[in-house]
Design a protein with these regions (language model features):
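Conserved AMP-binding/adenylate-forming core of the ANL superfamily
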Residues: 1-26, 65, 78-81, 117-120
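Conserved pre-ATP/AMP-binding loop-to-beta segment of ANL
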Residues: 81-104, 131-137
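Conserved AMP-binding A3 loop
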Residues: 99-127
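Conserved AMP-binding/adenylation subdomain of ANL enzymes
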Residues: 123-136, 144-184
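Gly/Ser/Thr-rich phosphate-binding loop
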Residues: 196-252
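Conserved ATP/PPi-binding loop(s) of AMP-dependent carboxylate-activating enzymes
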Residues: 264-296, 302, 320-322
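AMP-binding/adenylate-forming catalytic core of the ANL superfamily
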Residues: 292-342
């Protein structure tokens, strides 16, 4: 049976995973996990037994989260007797799950806000089939965040292998890519920038996905040099809505089937409430939610657009609204002068 997870020097097979799930028939509704394997085991237990789960980041300040006290964390709850004979049974239970999973926004622009998702919304973008089997994923996201959950479900539902590279240094990441012959990487543009400079190319990587931040052609060119065999695409996702659409390069297209679920007001992308999770913190403009993402149309009729910045990233300089991301791009474009700049 294939490896499920490589975490540091530890290897966990899918057989070990199933045995661990069956062994202790309890879970933690609110859990700060000591390690990634324990986190995944608890997540899977909740999902396959239709139990609610609140995902807590290790550095989440609970004093900022109403209704949750420290004494409630890591307290086990008994589960109804169950037994899974193999991964087919586990995945069948997952795909029928009625669990509600609570995650929190990062809190970078204020207090963390909780958003409740069904398993259906969390796995909306998962693709299953023979072409997705036998893959090895670099796990580069925080596991309690939306992007981390989506990478997990994509890998898990195809019984792929996950290799933990979250918060690793550049040399460590390259060591994992080479040692495990990683085929798929999904990460923020910041993660890929931290891989620069590079000394060699890695031919095992078949697909590279970027998400969570603005990226640019200069970064795509460098990624292509590091991973010359990889297809590069960009994903638009949010804690509130999950994954919505992908792009090749920096140009997204809203699919025709859901184009009526979006609106743009003063360059800000608005998302229809039917695509969102549930949260008391959501405020709607009619039936639409203000994403805070500023875009520019490339072809409005066909639904093509580029992501410009977050609305709250704009700063006032001498009475003018300035986008730090555009300043960063301009500085990085000065050939031979600047190695890397972050604004």
């Amino acid at each position: 049976m294939a490896a499920f997870l490589y975490n540091g020097e530890r290897k966990y097979s899918y057989e070990v995973l199933i045995n661990t799930i069956n062994q202790h028939q309890e879970y933690f509704p609110l859990y700060k996990a000591p390690d990634l394997f324990s986190y995944f085991v608890n997540l899977i237990k909740a999902v396959v037994t239709n139990s609610p789960l609140v995902l807590l980041d290790s550095d989440l300040n609970l004093s900022e989260v109403p209704g949750i006290e420290e004494s409630m964390v890591n307290k086990p709850t008994k589960l109804t007797n169950y037994h899974f004979s193999d991964m087919t049974a586990v995945l069948s239970a997952l795909r029928q799950s009625t669990s509600e999973i609570t995650i929190f926004t990062s809190g970078t622009t204020g207090q963390p806000k909780k958003v409740v998702h069904s398993v259906d919304t969390l796995t909306r973008s998962v693709r299953i089939g023979e072409k997705y089997e036998g893959k090895v994923w670099a796990y580069a996201y925080n596991p309690t965040h939306m992007a981390g959950l989506q990478v997990f479900f994509q890998a898990f539902e195809n019984q792929n292998t996950l290799v933990n590279v979250f918060n690793m240094q550049r040399d460590e990441v390259y060591e994992k890519i080479a040692g495990h012959r990683i085929t798929h990487i999904s990460a923020t543009p910041t993660f890929y920038r931290l891989l620069l400079p590079f000394e060699q190319s890695y031919l095992s990587v078949q697909k590279v996905t970027l998400g969570g931040e603005k990226s640019n052609n200069h970064l795509y060119e460098n990624i292509h040099k590091i991973f010359p065999e990889a297809k590069i695409n960009n994903v638009y996702a949010s804690t509130e809505a999950g994954s919505l659409f992908a792009a090749k390069g920096d140009c997204f297209q809203i699919p025709a089937a859901i184009r009526d679920k979006f609106a743009v007001v003063e360059d800000e992308l608005l998302i229809h409430k039917s695509l969102l999770g549930k949260s008391d913190s959501f405020s709607f403009d009619g039936d639409y939610y203000h994403s805070g993402d500023l875009i520019e149309w490339v072809d409005k009729e066909e639904g093509f657009f580029k992501f410009k910045s977050r609305k709250n990233e704009l700063i006032n300089v001498g009475g003018y609204k300035v986008n730090p991301g555009e300043v960063e791009d301009a500085i990085n474009a000065i050939e031979g002068k600047i190695g890397r700049a972050h604004v």
